[in-house]
Structures are given as structure tokens and as C-alpha cells.
A protein has these predicted regions:
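Residue-level detector of conserved catalytic or cofactor/ligand-binding positions
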Residues: 236-244
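Immediate post-signal peptide segment of exported/extracytoplasmic ligand-binding proteins
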Residues: 41-48, 142-143
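A short LG(V/I)-centered, amphipathic sequence patch enriched
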Residues: 1-14
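Central regulatory/effector-binding core of bacterial HTH transcription factors
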Residues: 45-108, 176-177
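C-terminal regulatory
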Residues: 75, 85, 89-93, 107-189, ...
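A bilobed periplasmic-binding-protein/Venus flytrap-type ligand-binding module shared by bacterial periplasmic
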Residues: 123-127, 223-234
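Paired acidic/hydrophobic, glycine-rich loop segments that form the ligand-binding mouth/hinge
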Residues: 97-101, 192-197
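Alpha-helical linker/hinge and terminal dimerization helices associated
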Residues: 19-41
Length: 244
């Protein structure tokens, strides 16, 4: 029995779920073969569903999309902004084809191709004692003054690990938002500081650039990568999704 009709709405039984997954795999295989044949003919076409984490999307997509649309007019590009856990689930369930993520955050079953390093900077309030410094060591940061992203954002996890404070890290502020811009606005009106990626630096107004401080050498960067599920074969579409 493939359907459980005793439930409202009707749902698939355990056996039914297996059959449905096999059917999905067959359809994916058919689509992949068809598109691979087109690639062998030298034609890059089809649909590319791309997921992007919130700490990349605002700073990279507007540079990437115009050239992509111009260079690959036969590719239908669909972009979704989502946190890493949702990206992993979407990749495994074939809801997206690829994603731009921080390397090392997707876990088993996902392949990553690293693209570039993205350094971290401190963004420090003029009211904070570290404001007068041009270079800051991580151990000098008072964790009570550090504002970070809400749970679900992989950059939050990276910052917590960087500060070696894990789940117990105290903070005056925590936001249910993936917005680095919000964190910087909070820093502007408090005595706090936050940590931002290099790709966000060019969008900071010139009158606030003095709040940017370099971090001492060490684990003070992330690697940006393209991620796909292991069974994905549309390699030419993945190649063209790499920002230049």
C-alpha cells in the first residue's frame, strides 16, 4: 500500500515514500541526461536554481547577475536567499541545483568547490575602547560588547568558534535577522562592535570607514564556495554560476 487514506490529507506510506523518491531520482536522471547531451553539443541551456546565504547575497548577486544574463541567455536563473541548513535540505531534496555558501558548513553528501577567501574585519563603535586601535587581536574583544547574527546563520557559528566561546557567549544583543547591515547600525548607536566579511566593506559609507579595524592573522576569514549535491551532473551550469 503506497497511500495512507486514513489520514487527512492523504499521505504516502513508508513504502510509498520509497517509490516517490525512486520516481524523483528517475526524473532527475532523465533531465540530467537531456541537459548533458545539450552540453556536449556546445549549448549551455536549462534552468539553474541557485541558493545564496544572507551574508553573501547583498554583496555579490548584483555583480554576478547582469553578466550571467548577458553571457547565458538560454539559462533560466532562479535565486533564493536562505540560511545554510535550508540550503543543505534544498540541495538534498532537489529544490535547488547549487548554492553559494561558506566552505565547510554543509556537511556530508554535499560537494564544495572553493572560490575565494573573504577576510573578517571588526566594525567598532567610536564609544568602544578598541576604536583607537587599527589592528585587533580576537582575544582582546570583550564578548559582552560583541553583537552577532541570529542562530541559523553560519557566519554566527564561525564567529563564535573564532572567539572560542561556543554557546555560552554572552552578548547584549541578538537578532532574529540575517542582516549584517542591521548589526552595523546597532554598533553606530551603541558602544558595541561586530565582525563583518570583506565583501561588505565597500558598501560602508566613507564617513564610517574609520570604524573598520583589521583582525590579527589567524583564523580570521571564511572561504566562499559553490556547493552541489554529490549526484549533480550539470557541471557546465555549476561552472558558470561561479562569480568572477
Amino acid at each position: 500500500q503506497l497511500l495512507d487514506r486514513s489520514k487527512k490529507p492523504v499521505i504516502a506510506t513508508e513504502a510509498g515514500e520509497v517509490v516517490l523518491e525512486r520516481a524523483r531520482e528517475t526524473l532527475r536522471a532523465y533531465d540530467n541526461i537531456r541537459e548533458s547531451v545539450a552540453e556536449l553539443k556546445g549549448e549551455i541551456a536549462g534552468r539553474l536554481r541557485l541558493g545564496v546565504i544572507p551574508t553573501i547575497a547583498p554583496y555579490l548577486l548584483h555583480k554576478f547577475i547582469p553578466d550571467f544574463v548577458r553571457d547565458y541567455p538560454k539559462v533560466e536563473l532562479e535565486i533564493s536567499e536562505m540560511v545554510t541548513s535550508d540550503i543543505v535540505e534544498a540541495l538534498k531534496r532537489d529544490r535547488i541545483d547549487a548554492a553559494l555558501v561558506a566552505s565547510g558548513t554543509c556537511g556530508e553528501g554535499i560537494l564544495e568547490q572553493e572560490l575565494f577567501n573573504d577576510r573578517f574585519y571588526a566594525y567598532v563603535s567610536p564609544e568602544n575602547p578598541l576604536y583607537e586601535r587599527q589592528n585587533i587581536r580576537i582575544e582582546e574583544i570583550d564578548l559582552k560588547d560583541l553583537v552577532i547574527l541570529s542562530p541559523g546563520n553560519c557566519m554566527r557559528d564561525q564567529i563564535i568558534e573564532l572567539c572560542q566561546a561556543r554557546r555560552s557567549m554572552p552578548s547584549h544583543y541578538s537578532f532574529e535577522s540575517g542582516s549584517l547591515d542591521t548589526l552595523m547600525r546597532i554598533v553606530d548607536c551603541t558602544s558595541c562592535l561586530t565582525i563583518i566579511p570583506e565583501m561588505a566593506v565597500e558598501y560602508i559609507p566613507s564617513d564610517r570607514r574609520d570604524r573598520l579595524k583589521t583582525l590579527s592573522k589567524g583564523a580570521t576569514s571564511r572561504k566562499i564556495a559553490v556547493a552541489v549535491r554529490r549526484t549533480y551532473v550539470k557541471l557546465s551550469l555549476i561552472h558558470i554560476s561561479e562569480p568572477t
